Amino acid sequence: MTLKKHRGKMSEKSNVNKKFTNSTQNNSNWSNSPSMINPESFINNPNLIVFKNWVDKLQQEFPTCDVVDSKNNSITIKIRYDDVFRSIYKEVKKSVPDSKVSLKPCNDDKKYGMCMVVKSKTIIVGWEEWGFGKPIEISGEGEFTYYIPLENVINAFDSAWRMNNKGKPLHFKFMTRRLTPRDATTKGVSAEALSSPPTVGEIWHYITIEFVTVTTT
């Protein structure tokens, strides 16, 4: 994820605009998206140590990650919502260092009642290009605030998975479930990334990865 200046009509007091852009030259824009998937290793050796090593790497990136199903040609993992948020948090902070990013209750997310809130002294544009949808923008004295529903944050996370594994013989299926509400926990999540989480129950994001055999004639 890189930044690009936006040349639009702005107040003279506004700072330089910033934009999320997709750099096709760098496939590691989203550092917390698993671009390490090697489908050939799974297909040729489905037993496997390769599987365990890959899952271990995934769990290092996402502490709440767990394998919930595995078959000869596919696996299904689940990742808790705060790990999803944390990966997006890191990318926003890397692109807009002066920003303050948090996850808070909000009425604009009709599905989960939570929003990622981004505050910055600069205008940020290009959210829709990354799958976030159009955020609710509130401008104040020298500060811009963006509210992005958690549902859209998860959609952007999924887009990153597809982007980082583009061209590989893989199919992805994504699903999100909200379990019986109880106090949310913060296992594996830094206090800076997620402070005082609201009581939302546990929201889990499921990803099925299907390894497709490529045949040649």
Curated annotation (Swiss-Prot):
Q: Domain of life of the organism in this record?
A: Viruses
Q: Where is the composition biased (Low complexity)?
A: 22-32
Annotated region Disordered: the residues are 1-32
The protein in question is named Uncharacterized protein ORF217a
| Taxonomic source organism | Acidianus filamentous virus 2 (isolate Italy/Pozzuoli) (AFV-2)
